[in-house]
Each structure stands twice: as C-alpha cells, then as structure tokens.
C-alpha cells in the first residue's frame, strides 16, 4: 500500500475517532478571515479545551459517512475547519457564535451535538445557553433558596420572641 493512501486512511480514522468521542462538534467556513483572526480564534478555542483543525473535505466526508451522520455532507464544501470538544457541549458553539458576530467572514455551517446532527439554528440556540459552570451555579442557587428562606424565617421568629421578652 502506498504511503499516501496510508496517510489518508489514518486521517479518516483520526476524524472518525474524534467525531465519535466528542460531546460537541461544529463545522465552520473560515474563508475571508486573515491569519491574525484565525490565530485569535484558535487561542480562544484552545483556552476552552477545544481542538480546532482543518481537514480535507473528502476525508471528512468518508469519516462522516462511516459514523452515520447523514446531513453533514452538504456542509462539507469549501474551506472548512472543525471544532471538537470532548467535555463542554456548549463551549464550541458559544465561542464560534460570539466570534462570528464580530467577524462576519466566519460562517457556522452545521455540527454534531452528543451524537446527533445539528443544524445552524440548533447550534445558535445552543450558543445562547449558559455554560456548564453557569448551569451548576443556577442549580445550587435553586437548591439553597428553601434552606435560606427557612433560616431567615427561624431568625425572624427568634428575634420576635426576644422582642416580646424584653
């Protein structure tokens, strides 16, 4: 087997593995961004633990078909980059959507969220959600509210009884 064919097969295997292992994957068209803007985007994604890589569309198409993600083939035209996140489902969509607001040249095309193909609208909706940490803090506040209310009521009763005794 030729070295070129082996390299292509290993690239397809790498893409398949990343697609199946990632919690969230977003495909973007980066045409029109200059090197400085792409470097800035890569830094933002890297800081959030997201891998951002450019693959040939033909190799990506083979990996997508092997993983059974029908519906992504239409997004695999033109210069594309793929953002893979293994932990946070919201982070790639949020970072890319915020970057696209400031840089109109970046176009979000489609993605895969927890094993399901997602359209542009679904990714934009996901981008409006708070991060995992934000959701956990909201949950903590909701769980603390009844206990806090009970503590305030108990203190009020104690203060009232002290006022009556005095």
UniProtKB/Swiss-Prot annotation:
Keyword RNA-binding: yes
Recorded superkingdom: Bacteria
Keywords, in A-Z order: Ribonucleoprotein, Ribosomal protein, RNA-binding, rRNA-binding
Pfam families assigned to the protein according to its UniProt record, in alphabetical order: Ribosomal_L10
One of the GO BP terms on file: translation
GO CC annotations, alphabetized: cytosolic large ribosomal subunit
GO molecular function, a single term: structural constituent of ribosome
Annotated InterPro entries: Ribosomal_uL10, Ribosomal_uL10-like_sf, Ribosomal_uL10_bac, Ribosomal_uL10_bac_type, Ribosomal_uL10_CS_bac
Function: Forms part of the ribosomal stalk, playing a central role in the interaction of the ribosome with GTP-bound translation factors.
Quaternary structure and partners: Part of the ribosomal stalk of the 50S ribosomal subunit. The N-terminus interacts with L11 and the large rRNA to form the base of the stalk. The C-terminus forms an elongated spine to which L12 dimers bind in a sequential fashion forming a multimeric L10(L12)X complex.
Family annotation (HAMAP family): Ribosomal_uL10
Family statement drawn from the similarity comment of this UniProt entry: Belongs to the universal ribosomal protein uL10 family.
Name of the protein described by the UniProt record: Large ribosomal subunit protein uL10
Organism ancestry: Bacteria, Bacillati, Bacillota, Bacilli, Bacillales
């Amino acid at each position: 087997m030729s070295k070129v064919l082996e390299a292509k097969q290993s690239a397809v295997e790498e893409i398949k593995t990343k697609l199946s292992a990632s919690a969230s994957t977003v495909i973007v068209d980066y045409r029109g961004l200059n090197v400085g803007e792409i470097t800035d985007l890569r830094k933002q994604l890297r800081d959030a633990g997201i891998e951002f890589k450019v693959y040939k569309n033909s190799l990506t198409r083979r990996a997508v078909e092997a993983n059974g993600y029908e519906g992504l083939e239409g997004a695999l035209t033109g210069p594309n980059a793929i953002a893979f996140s293994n932990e946070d489902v919201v982070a790639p969509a949020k970072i890319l959507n915020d970057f696209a607001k400031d840089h109109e040249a970046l176009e979000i095309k489609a993605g895969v969220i927890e094993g399901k193909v997602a359209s542009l609208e679904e990714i934009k909706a996901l981008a409006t959600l708070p991060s995992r940490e934000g959701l956990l803090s909201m949950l903590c506040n909701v769980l603390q509210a009844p206990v806090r209310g009970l503590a305030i009521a108990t203190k009020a009763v104690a203060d009232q009884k002290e006022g009556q005794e005095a």
